[in-house]
């Protein structure tokens, strides 16, 4: 399957999809590629706990999706840079907002936003809300993304969520666009049985205590150092290969014929031949 640059992630509550979106973006940034993470959940805004408490988010995703006119420059200016990582930017709802904070998002505006966003960065990760049937943007994100990663859990609640939403996804999963994974897998759980309920899974992300601590301390952008995080990191890299065709490159290793290019910093991204807007 041909690789694209836009991935949508959807999953049950507690599956770790937002954590996964962050760690995927961080791994992409190591390759000096620009990535935008769109935290599209209007019910539980996640940008506030992905950034330091003293860092303000000026423009909300809700404002962009309901703007009378939308341009690439407006999207770019609304992006929030991740501290100490110039290759990653965030978009999402602000603290205290919800779906009722803005006028109804139209299909036309959501499509326009996604089309513009696709051309603004090397890679785009769309972290969809678990209640996607109530959010037109999340539904369209899954329709327009090149690949969709469905993340479930190996407990009964996760399986129940999948069964309740499977019908809404039927007819959309064609040509290998949808891939499934089990997240937050804990020792003692039966992932094989759960995988059967999901129709098979391509990835299993284990529970990591260090990840939970980072989540609680709003430090998910920090690297993982514990030994138990190794299998999780391995799965992250496997997803990047499957979805984006991004293979791990050893330090000092370049592709044949590849020439080094000078990076030109243009906040909030480091652009590499992306053109002017």
Where are these regions (language model features)?
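Phosphate-binding loop that captures ATP/GTP phosphates
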Residues: 31-88
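NTP-binding/hydrolysis catalytic cores, primarily Walker-type P-loop NTPases
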Residues: 217-277
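Walker A/P-loop phosphate-binding motif and the immediately C-terminal alpha-helix
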Residues: 2-43, 47, 117
